Amino acid sequence: MHRLAKIISNAGVCSRRDAEKLIVAGQVKVDGITILSPTTNVDISNQIEVSGTLINNIHKPRLWIYYKPVGLITTHKDPLSRKTVFEQLTGLPRVISIGRLDLNSEGLLLLTNSGDLARQFELPSSRLKRVYHVRAYGKSDILLKSNYKNLEIDGIFYNPHSIKLLKQNKTNCWFEVVLFEGKNREIRRIFEYCGLKVNKLIRIQYGSFTIDNLKPGDYKEINNKILENN
């Protein structure tokens, strides 16, 4: 048995908080009976309707790889009315992101219809590998010779797994950065602290999933068998 609001959220209909509001508003039925209490426990074998629509994907957590373009923020609602990732995903059911990428970053963003699946991926104990390719202006030796392990910046400790120089020319350098637990704007802050200005940041891998040949704005769904093995 599970909380009704949780089942609705995991089916990708809306957030758990919004599901609770729909229940209180009388918009949810279980086996034809209107339910008004968000704390009601139900079984996934029950027929659940939300605003007259039967939920039919309760049993199936789904996962997509999305190439997030630069210029979109990873949120459902933005008080500044900036363009969001989810406004562009008109071909998908309601999904949530696993982690996020900031406005000026691009690359692999995992999307799912399951809150439980998202939490499993995001737990620090999961130790999922995140790989980024970063272009920056400045001298690479400053960063590469620095002790970036357990680096404290403005009272926050950062601990990237590795930073490797890929190539450089007279104007900029490309690096590969590997994280196992990302913090807000971690890469940009470490590079800035070492005198480098990041002007391109692309996530190419999250866990076992890679961006492959996707172009900005493209997405693909992960096969269920692959998902079960991760």
UniProtKB/Swiss-Prot annotation:
GO terms for biological process: enzyme-directed rRNA pseudouridine synthesis. The keyword Heme does not apply. It comes from the Bacteria. The keyword Isomerase applies. Its EC number is 5.4.99.-. PROSITE patterns: PSI_RSU (PS01149), S4 (PS50889). It is an enzyme of class 5 (isomerase). Residues 2-69 form the S4 RNA-binding domain. Disulfide bonds: none annotated. Keywords: Isomerase, RNA-binding. This is Uncharacterized RNA pseudouridine synthase RC0807.
